[in-house]
From Swiss-Prot:
It is found in: Endoplasmic reticulum membrane; Golgi apparatus membrane. It comes from Eremothecium gossypii (strain ATCC 10895 / CBS 109.51 / FGSC 9923 / NRRL Y-1056) (Yeast). The keyword Iron-sulfur does not apply. Residues 163-188 are annotated as: Disordered. This is Protein YOP1. It comes from the Eukaryota. GO terms for biological process: endoplasmic reticulum inheritance; endoplasmic reticulum tubular network membrane organization; ER-dependent peroxisome organization; nuclear pore complex assembly; response to endoplasmic reticulum stress; vacuole organization; vesicle-mediated transport. One of its GO terms (molecular function) is membrane bending activity.
Length: 188
């Protein structure tokens, strides 16, 4: 329990540092005496609560909005980096997000069988979207890779063998032409 409290305290301190320059949060801190991180955490809890109670069906749009905006922010940063470490996590996230989008075609049936679906979906999307939690990597290695590797490996092998045979044919053709050209020059 002490470890959880310590982690929570570190997260709140990190939020205070990240939003140190925000004038609205500075005003909140000045007027209330509470740290900026409390306003951010409170807004986050209120957002999740609105999704949880799903007043007027707003849970769906709020869940999808958060599921798009947060990873989109990380994706825009990843595009500008030269490393590929974050790319796998983000691609995994977008694969799972797309899967949810297809499944939600039947959202009425899902909502009938899974109450609070939008809330659970939001929590899951946060888990796989935040790189600090490593959720996307976990989902990739435990679910996506075992399901897709047999098909992708087979396709890659066929493609590689197809490329190799084309290269061999081209090399033989070039060799035959070179031999023919050399024999043609020697007969001149």
């Amino acid at each position: 329990m002490a470890e959880i409290a310590g982690n929570l305290q570190r997260i709140l301190q990190s939020l205070d540092r990240q939003f140190a320059g925000n004038k609205y949060l500075q005003e909140f801190e000045r007027k209330t005496g509470f740290p900026k991180s409390y306003a951010i955490a409170g807004a986050g809890v209120a957002y999740l609560f609105i999704i949880f109670i799903n007043v007027g069906g707003v849970g769906e749009i709020l869940s999808n909005f958060l599921g798009f905006v947060l990873p989109c922010y990380y994706s825009l940063h990843a595009i500008k980096t030269t490393t590929t470490a974050d790319d796998t996590e983000l691609l995994t996230y977008w694969i799972v997000f797309a899967f949810f989008s297809v499944i939600e075609f039947w959202s009425k049936a899902i909502l009938y069988w899974v109450p609070f679906y939008w809330f659970f979906k939001t929590i899951f999307l946060i888990f796989i979207a935040l790189p600090q939690l490593g959720g996307a990597s976990l989902i990739y290695h435990r679910v996506i890779a075992p399901l897709t590797d047999p098909y992708i490996a087979a396709g890659s092998q066929r493609k590689a063998s197809g490329i190799s045979s084309k290269m061999e044919q081209a090399a033989k053709g070039a060799s035959a032409r070179a031999t023919g050209a050399a024999s043609h020059q020697s007969s001149d």
